[in-house]
Amino acid sequence: MNDYKLEEDPVTKERTFKRFAPRKGDKIYQEFKKLYFYSDAYRPLKFACETIIEEYEDEISSLIAQETHYLADKLCSEKSDLCETSANHTEL
C-alpha cells in the first residue's frame, strides 16, 4: 500500500491512487527498497482493498478451491466486475 500515492485531478477533483514505487524487476528496485515511506494517505486504498476482499470472499474461496487458471483475471473481471476483460492482471 505504501507504493501508491493519492492524487487529485485539479480540474475534475477526482481522486485516484497512482503507483510511484518501482516493481521488483525494475533496475532501481534494489536502491528503492532501502527507503521507508509511511503516510496515512494510503489508508483509503487499504480500506477499499479490504472491503473488496470481504465482499467477494466466497467467490475468492471458491475460485481458489477449484484451482482456477487465470485466477487474477477471473477475480478482477468476472467476479467483482471491477476491471476491463482485456486487462492483464498479473499482480494479484
Swiss-Prot record:
The UniProt entry's coiled-coil ranges are: none
List, alphabetically, the InterPro entries matched: CNPY, DUF3456
User: Which Pfam families has this protein been placed in?
Assistant: DUF3456
- Give the similarity note: Belongs to the canopy family.
* The protein's name: Protein canopy homolog 1
Q: What is the lineage of its organism?
A: Eukaryota, Metazoa, Chordata, Craniata, Vertebrata
State the gene name recorded for this protein: CNPY1
